[in-house]
Amino acid sequence: MSRRKQTNPNKVHWDQVFAGLEEQARQAMMKTDFPGDLGSQRQAIQQLRDQDSSSSDSEGDEEETTQDEVSSHTSEEDGGVVKVEKELENAEQPVGGKKVVEHEVTENLHSDPLLGLCQCPLCQLDCGSREQLIAHVYQHTAAVVSAKSYMCPVCGRALSSPGSLGRHLLIHSEDQRSNCAVCGARFTSHATFNSEKLPEVLNVESLPPAHSEGPSSAEGKDIAFTPPVYPAGILLVCNNCAAYRKLLEAQTPSVRKWALRRQNEPLEVRLQRLERERTAKKSRRDNETPEEREVRRMRDREAKRLQRMQETDEQRARRLQRDREAMRLKRANETPEKRQARLIREREAKRLKRRLEKMDMMLRAQFGQDPSAMAALAAEMNFFQLPVSGVELDSQLLGKMAFEEQNSSSLH
């Protein structure tokens, strides 16, 4: 059975971003460069005007174009022509002004072409360099994280910790292993991770001395690979990434302290932290409204369904074994009231399954793939409370049939 792989639409591809910025910079420099004397430049401007007028006359005979496109196109060209004319008038001024113009042109040519073009893909903020742009995008993680939980930007699922969010984001990637969002290197396995790093980014000499002592200092392939660090947000980064280490130095002390503490966290401290997170999650769920609970459950079900679609046979076998062990332990410690409620739920599930088995094959497949249809079917079956005996079940079914007949007669 084929498993459909889904991509993460919020993944930042730095190579594509900077390639587009460099192309924009080159185009901007080419547009401001007009070789030749002033007479030839004026002839070029006149040719542009003639082309614009001829194209506007021939547009009505050729393909159909909207009025908005034509007006925006002509306004942009007219604006460019007026701008060039103003520059030429300034160039015809005395020698002092001409020197100033030439000095500005040479300054623009020798400056960084990416200056002012390093825009954040999330908020369109201009950054001075690539390092500042990467650090700024990392700051967006504070906007993603709320005071209570960590929200997935793809499906909106609420998770209790940054590590859980990072592991959850893998189900939205192209495969189970993603690429580093800071340096852009794709890793397909733990063995080939270091060899597939970008050499211009992963320079060992540029590593900070404060972090070069740990096991994740990227000194060679003989060092054991440590699990990746997933920060609190939409970025997936790796421990061995030098760009990520530089990025950590630019963050606030609290963020650096959090990342270092997670890397060197002992087992007992980790267990205590997980217990605190579970307690906080339980208290948060106890205080949520019924609408919030329903939305959370729908998000969890959808995320679990997507995750199970992408798991392998070995992962599925391990998950089923864990579920059986947990179910056995839970049933051994449940109270009589919880056992009665569980039996009622199982009885409802069996009724729903038998109802689906009586349907047509195509309709059954449609119901199985549509969660809203399944919810509607369950709501229809639960129109009355689950009875205790079969006699009450028959009486309630008869009452429901009579109620439906009354509604149909009133409609006719």
Swiss-Prot record:
Record has Transcription regulation as a keyword: yes
GO terms for biological process, alphabetical: regulation of transcription by RNA polymerase II
Biased composition (Acidic residues): 58-67
PROSITE patterns linked to this entry: ZINC_FINGER_C2H2_1, ZINC_FINGER_C2H2_2
InterPro entries in the cross-refs: Znf_C2H2_sf (IPR036236), Znf_C2H2_type (IPR013087)
The keyword Ligase appears for this protein: no
Zinc finger (C2H2-type) in chain: 116-140, 150-172
Molecular function GO labels: DNA-binding transcription factor activity; RNA polymerase II cis-regulatory region sequence-specific DNA binding; zinc ion binding
Keywords assigned: Coiled coil, DNA-binding, Metal-binding, Nucleus, Repeat, Transcription, Transcription regulation, Zinc, Zinc-finger
Annotated coiled-coil segments of the chain: 257-366
Region described as Disordered: spans on this chain: 26-83, 278-319
Alphabetical list of Gene3D superfamilies matching this protein: Classic Zinc Finger
Subcellular location, record wording: Nucleus
GO cellular component, one term: nucleus
Task performed by this protein: May be involved in transcriptional regulation.
Family: Belongs to the krueppel C2H2-type zinc-finger protein family.
Name of the protein in question: Zinc finger protein 821
Gene this protein is translated from: ZNF821
